[in-house]
């Protein structure tokens, strides 16, 4: 009877919480015309839907917990026109358990030169189907060792600061010291002078992304300055000839170089490097980086730092489908076909064999299983 009473009480609480949650609608034909108006009215657990359109100069602070902030229809565009809330970002998210979907963020600047599309100051964030561009920073987060962040099916590009003028870097993605960061099925490109992806998370999972310079030259494609545990699987990496740094990937460049428990797994990625004399990886730590089934193409010929290599192919006749447009799928005559091995499990039990592959733009698809695995980010279908 006591258990039943407690159960009824819990169910009653859940029902009350669910009943209190509301959906706030924003749009030119709605009572709430701007997202910033909804930010002042929303309660914990609410859903805020925003009609498609451009919302110029509108910035907001969201202090609530458990929010879903969702654009409807064609992309909702928050063009801040140089403004930022709290001199930080278009949206400053202070609460926990926040989801942001189908929204475009651009134009953020701040006097501190780190005006972001989103500044996240809470615990646990999910970003889906969003586009961050032409801000000083795309996404910027703080330190929170309890926080997990997931970005999927999203695009970040051209978030930067004029380094020649100000001497500071802007990054497409800058993740602070959090517990767990996952980036998957996303398109991260053209971080001029800054990094495409910079993360100080304790665990980093970069899965099935296209991370590339293309029109600009980034500092690093991926910078993990504090090391940690990192799993880079099934990505396309392209570094341009005018990149700021020689290395495509940097691991533990700033801290924890002598920490023996760090782990770096680089599995079934395709690297194309147009930077003459560059390196695919610069591992600054004493930990041994594990590289398996990677396709390594272009001007770079070096992997710097302790490493263990298995079934990688360097500068072979890869026969990529449309390399000039960064389409690195394999043609039937590629030397990468059936040349890989089953990479097995990481030390923590994480499966290293790629289950998916990137599909442009901003998508993923199941990677076929046909005979021995192909080297690189793509499996030739129908072989």
Predicted region positions:
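N-terminal secretory signal peptides that target proteins for export/translocation
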Residues: 1-4
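Right-handed parallel beta-helix/beta-solenoid
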Residues: 18-37, 41, 319-324
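Extracellular beta-rich repeat passengers
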Residues: 36, 51, 56-329, 333-335, ...
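Alpha-helix initiation/capping motif
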Residues: 24-28, 284, 368
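N-terminal non-cleavable signal-anchor helices
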Residues: 7-9, 27, 376
């Amino acid at each position: 009877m006591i258990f039943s009473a407690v159960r009824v009480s819990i169910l009653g609480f859940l029902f009350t919480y669910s009943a209190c949650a509301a959906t706030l609608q924003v749009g030119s034909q709605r009572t709430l015309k701007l997202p910033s108006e909804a930010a002042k009215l929303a309660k914990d657990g609410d859903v805020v839907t925003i009609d498609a359109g451009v919302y110029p100069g509108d910035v907001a602070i969201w202090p609530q917990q458990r929010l879903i902030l969702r654009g409807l229809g064609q992309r909702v565009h928050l063009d801040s026109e140089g403004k930022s809330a709290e001199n930080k970002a278009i949206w400053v998210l202070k609460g926990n358990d926040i989801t942001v979907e189908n929204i475009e963020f651009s134009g953020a600047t701040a006097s501190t030169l780190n005006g972001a599309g989103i500044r996240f100051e809470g615990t646990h964030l999910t970003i889906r189907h969003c586009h961050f561009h032409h801000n000083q920073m795309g996404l910027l987060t703080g330190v929170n060792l309890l926080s997990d962040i997931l970005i999927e099916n999203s695009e970040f590009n051209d978030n930067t600061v004029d380094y020649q003028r100000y001497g500071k870097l802007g990054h497409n993605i800058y993740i602070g010291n959090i517990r767990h960061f996952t980036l998957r099925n996303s398109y991260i490109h053209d971080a001029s002078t800054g990094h495409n992806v910079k993360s100080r998370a304790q665990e980093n999972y970069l899965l099935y992304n296209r991370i590339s310079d293309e029109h600009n030259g980034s500092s690093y494609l991926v910078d993990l300055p504090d090391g940690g545990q990192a799993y880079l699987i099934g990505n396309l990496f392209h570094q341009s000839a005018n990149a700021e740094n020689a290395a495509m990937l940097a691991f533990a460049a700033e801290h924890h170089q002598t920490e023996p428990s760090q782990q770096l797994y680089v599995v079934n990625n395709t690297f194309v490097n147009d930077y003459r004399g560059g390196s695919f990886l610069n591992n600054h730590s004493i930990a041994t980086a594990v590289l398996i089934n990677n396709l390594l193409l272009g001007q770079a010929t070096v992997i710097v730092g302790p490493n263990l290599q298995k079934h990688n192919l360097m500068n072979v006749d890869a026969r990529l489908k449309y390399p000039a447009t960064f389409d690195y799928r394999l043609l039937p005559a590629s030397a990468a076909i059936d040349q890989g091995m089953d990479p097995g499990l990481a030390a923590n039990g994480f499966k290293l064999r790629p289950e998916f592959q990137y599909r442009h733009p901003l998508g993923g698809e199941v990677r076929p299983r046909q005979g021995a695995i192909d080297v690189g980010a793509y499996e030739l279908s129908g072989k």
